[in-house]
Amino acid sequence: MPARPRILFVAEAVTLAHLARPAALAACLDPARYDARIACADAARRFLGAGAAQAEPLRSIAAASFAQRLAAGQPVYTLAELRDYVTDDLALFDRVQPELVVGDFRLSLSVSARLAGVPYLAISNAYWSPWAADRSLPLPVLPWTRWVPLALAQRGFDLVRPLVLAPHCRPLQRLRRAHGLPPLPADLRQVYTDADRVLYADDAALFPLGDDAPPQHRHLGPVPWSPPLPLPPWWTELPAGQDLAYVTMGSSGPAQALPLLVAALRGLGLGVVVATAGAPLPAPGAGVWAADYLPGELAAARARIVVCNGGAPTAQQALAAGAPVLGVCSNMDQFLHMRGLAAHGLGRALRADRLGAPAIAAAAAALLAAPRPAPRPAPALRERFTPHVDALLAARAAPARTATPPLAPAATAR
């Protein structure tokens, strides 16, 4: 093994979250000990910052295509796309020569890392684990769900769920079979978390695993990240004495809901700070400040309430600052995350297909009236992540690899 083992982080930049976590993890490694590289689509590089790990080019499907398929309830990848991904992955490995690959939603690594004989560590969320304590799946927003009573729609979804989710598993299963790899269990959660080791970027107290979880599946804890972009000129003009709401739908939320959200929050007397992620927003009126992107940790720290799509990245920024979360959820990932927060009194979820000003105002007012949550800052990332890297590197350096390498100390999970 070289003096500085090369760790390749592979970011599937279909949403900003799947770039953010690899970028934060690559940045946390000691550069004197590790040669960290990050592979991502060219369009995502602007979010890495000047001091980031060396970037390597890698194709991803268009974020818009991913979002459209997700909203329609279709498989997010075709077999042909995953086949091309494997070709690109193997060319990347040949060029970079990594000792360890760390992936975030790059499903093709289930095949390509095994073909290359490179240890593969996957970053995911605990509510997607096959061994999550709560393994039920909520009904996402689909083209037909707004027209059906919700309780009836959920019961129907529960009955047909295996049939509905099977097509989402099929492309990767066929790809594995084509390369002589054994099939995975017929479970979307298995498809999302197949790796030599899986680390869950969640607070273990909020999203526990069951007692039957295997040793290679463990919590890492939250992975904080904000885009390394300058603050807008108006940032210093925010009124110190006014309660603020921080609103962002991110890269995977219903951007069309922004005007409705802003109006409802202004109706509660809140100032509103908005990160639009590039979505159009009517000219802000008094008490509204907008930018394409903001450092979410700073915005959440200024906010009395955070309104987002319910996904982990922004919600974790809110929790770290002690701000309650109002999640406007569309896809299953967002509903799963907000279910965990709501169960602990840290937030409320609204469905994007049943969104209206009265519901927004009522949910926000209830969160504002409740006691403010205690801040939940994430422990130092380097100390949590490095032991897992070292364990996998040590296993690869051993003459024979016969078992899953030992885990990092349990203290690495929050």
Residues covered by each model-derived region:
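Short, basic, glycine/proline-bearing loop/turn elements
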Residues: 11, 72-78, 93, 168-176, ...
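C-terminal intrinsically disordered extensions
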Residues: 189-232, 389-414
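Donor-nucleotide binding loops and adjacent catalytic segments primarily
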Residues: 26-27, 46, 205-305
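Structural motif
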Residues: 12-13, 41, 201-203, 249-252
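Glycosyltransferase specificity loop/lid
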Residues: 2-114, 118-133, 137-150, 275-298, ...
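Active-site-proximal region of nucleotide-activated glycan assembly enzymes
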Residues: 121-208, 214
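Flexible loop residues that form catalytic
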Residues: 106, 203-204, 250, 311
